[in-house]
Amino acid sequence: MTEPLSVQQMAQRLKSADNILILCHKNPDGDTVGCGSALYYALKALDKNAAVLCSDTVPARYAFTNAHLFKGEFEPETVVAVDVAGLQLFGEGNGVPRYSRHVDLCIDHHAGNSGYADFTLLDGSAAAAAELMYRVILEMGVDITPHIADCLYTGVATDTGCFRFSATTANTHLVAAKLIEAGCHVEELNTLLFDTKPRARMEAERIARNHLEYYLDGRCALIYLTRDEIEQTGVDPADLEELTSLPISIEGVKVGLTLRQQPGGSYRISVRTAKGVDACAIARRLGGGGHNRAAGCELLGNLENAKNAILAEVEAELDAPQEDA
């Protein structure tokens, strides 16, 4: 069972540690990469030995974060997870399981965090883990340099859909304002993160749009990409994350589903919902999780089986009495 920590307590433990390994989640997004990189540079500012490790390759769009990736050059004494809600999200690549089996510290904003770490700083009201990381770094006594600000802004902006998602709060905007004051390159980052799409990404979107299907009297929209189609386009898997917003953007749709076949044949399913429909409840019943309006899971089997399984849970959720989510 994990022991909860305050921001101050987490900062103190990090200041007292050394030889620190920072773990990101598999299929890394801007929040986990941004948090991991920001913490890395904060620890280096305190003359700590640190590195970042992820089971998957960091997407090219986040290469500017430029944190040192762990190559086994030291024996970690403290393992810190950032933006990782459960053990199953660490992945199997790059030797991660050797270190993820015992995590000392966790900084996260997923309300469904499984409590796998010895000590956890958790705030489910934060729109991004980067909001928490900003407070931790300040409490560590480290200046927010322009580069640290860039890393943190990446986390905040990407996890909120450039401040459009419902989890965005006044505090989210306040943190972003502080990062801009610290020298964050906001225009360049917004262009890179939201306004620049590789040709391969556009081709994948074209294929996915051609697969658009409606279910449950138009209340659910679904798109999918098979492994062959993903490989055919040559798209970076990280660039497919943006596709998840397509189905839910359609007028009248309450649940948007995006299915992407993984290298092993399973289907990774992203669930996005309109207000009042709990995406996390849908995903959780299939072994996944996430947030109220954005969640996901992974299912074994062929495309039709994956569709049938997720659609059954969507129907159950849509037909259940709803509360504001």
Mark where each language-model region is:
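Short, motif-level signal for alpha-helix interfacial/capping segments enriched in acidic residues
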Residues: 2, 6-9, 85, 136-139
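Hydrophobic helix-and-loop "lid/oligomerization" segment in the mid-to-C-terminal part
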Residues: 2-61, 72-78, 158-285, 290-325
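A generic local secondary-structure boundary/capping motif
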Residues: 11, 68-70, 93-96, 120-123, ...
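Glycine-rich, phosphate-binding/catalytic loops in enzymes
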Residues: 39-40, 96-99, 122-123, 174
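Structural signal for conserved beta-strand scaffold positions within catalytic alpha/beta enzyme cores
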Residues: 54, 81, 106, 121-123, ...
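Active-site cofactor/cluster-binding pocket
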Residues: 63-119
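Short alpha-helices
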Residues: 110-175
